[in-house]
Amino acid sequence: MKKRVIGFAVAALAVGCATAALQPMPAGKLPDPTGLAINKGREIAFVNPLPRMRCGKVQCGTYNNWELAFPGVLTTAGADFGNALWSLRKVVWADRRLVFVDGRTLVCQLNWIRDHIHQMKGYRHWEYDLTSFLDFILDTQRADGQFYELIKQLDDFHWTFVPPDCRILYPEDNQSLVRLELEADIEYLMVEGCLQAWRVTGDDAWLRRALPRLEKGIDYMTRDPKRWDAAHGLCKRPYTIDTWDFTNDPRSGGNRSVVLTEPMAIMHGDNSGVYQAMNQLAWINERFGNAAKAASWRARAEALKANMFKHLWNGTFFCHQLPLNCEPLDAHEKERLSLSMAYALNRDILTTEQKRGVVAEYKARRKTTKGFSEWFTIDPAYSPSFKGNPPGRYVNGALSPFTAGELAKGAFECGEEAYGWDILDRVAKMVKRDDGKLYFLYDPVTGQPQGGGPSAWGAAAVLSAVDEGLAGVQDLDVQYRKIRFAPRWAVTPFAEGRYLTGYEASHKTVDVRWIFTDKGFRYHLRSPAQTVQAHLLVPSGKTPKALRVNGREMAFVLSTVGESRYVDAAVTPQDGVADFEVFY
């Protein structure tokens, strides 16, 4: 009987389902953007709330919104640029590692502190452990101030390339801690890395503990006979290609030590890096109330800068290497453009006009190079080869996204905004062509990837160029308490969009909306900032007549950088919002 009742009920339900038609749901209707709170009281209204999948017939977003990340962008013109940023983030994510050594667990972007710090320009936005690797390098600093740089398993024989005082072995972990002695960039990179990490965490106590060790590292670079050339007042290194870790001597593959009787030279990138570090140390000391120390570091920085321009400047850019105890490898050192020149654009050592001259040199060489771009590791390359690498191979002339990123960022700051965007656009198209990949180096003629290093290094540089150059969001203090806001979306095809950045680890978000119209343009900035230094690029051919901030008219300064014009104003946000309307 029980079975018959259940069977009857199921049968009746089936009949009901077969005969009853589903009623259509009411048609969906999107809200009128003019009625949104973000447009209340504003004359220039945002038209398309973002994120969205389509703007009319244009697919402008993805189904699950992978554009929404730090940093991320959505535009009404299409999804390609947002997809490119997503792909670049994945390239950086792929280098994340854990290293287990001496009872510690370290989060590393690869096992080299150099790569870790260069890649921090990207991953600082989402990583939650920014200090474990830095702490290990700080804690193992040598008594004279030298830092170690890489952790490798013992059967990777990097530890055999250096003298005993440049290595520590951890046999229980089968690991080695090594300093390739001929490298001359680690001490200044540690200053940069610790400052970047602190901006995210806001941990003043941590930075105070690190500060004496960072200062000791720069003192070592500017005093030790292996590092410092007293006659020129500049840092020196063995005669390498730019910042790389081998010389033209075939023996340098297995011996990476500094031997002062071997060819030595002064490379500009080591010195612009130390100059930047000195100014960063001055800024940190000033923040902590050490005015005398801050003044001393600034004075040392200016002396170093003066020596750089006296001995290395060729009138347009810094020459590659100044040989000290040997003849130049060829006749082209004074005209050789090396990758550290792109970095120098962003180390505050050049005036605006000097930056423009450097950018002009890259643009001119783009027209004459046989390669597909001007993103040189070095140009001209050494011929017939450098330690077995012919022209165009590895750092002897291959093309690099890290040069592209630094060059683009520098271009945005010196009135070459359209060129900066052109570089980013070319990179984005390469990423799309290669199914979301970006490689460490490329053959200049064929465009094929060469490998030889971490792709994330270049991806992070490009992300940084987008974040601080194109989007123009610069953290001037800690956790975005003070922001320089210098967006350059006016040189892109994106008339309306949204940009997101921030620090996941400290739960800080910067959310930017923009739109360009016939009557003017508008930026809506929501952030943790207590003060905002606005520097808003005006579209070419337009003249700004008025500025409103949060609906109220405000005085502004019209500044000029090259041929570009900017609306400048110092603003105190209201409830986390600074809303800029600029009228023509």
Q: What function would you assign to each model-found segment?
A:
Residues V5-A14:
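Sec-dependent N-terminal signal peptides
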Residues M25-A69, T75, G82-N83, C108-W112, ...:
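Catalytic cores of carbohydrate-active enzymes
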Residues F70-A77, N83-I113, I117-K121:
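Asp/Glu-centered strand-loop micro-motifs enriched in Gly/Pro and often flanked by an aromatic residue
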Residues S257, T261-M264, D330-R365, Y394, ...:
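Aromatic (Trp/Tyr) and acidic
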Residues E406-Y584:
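Non-catalytic C-terminal accessory modules of carbohydrate-active enzymes
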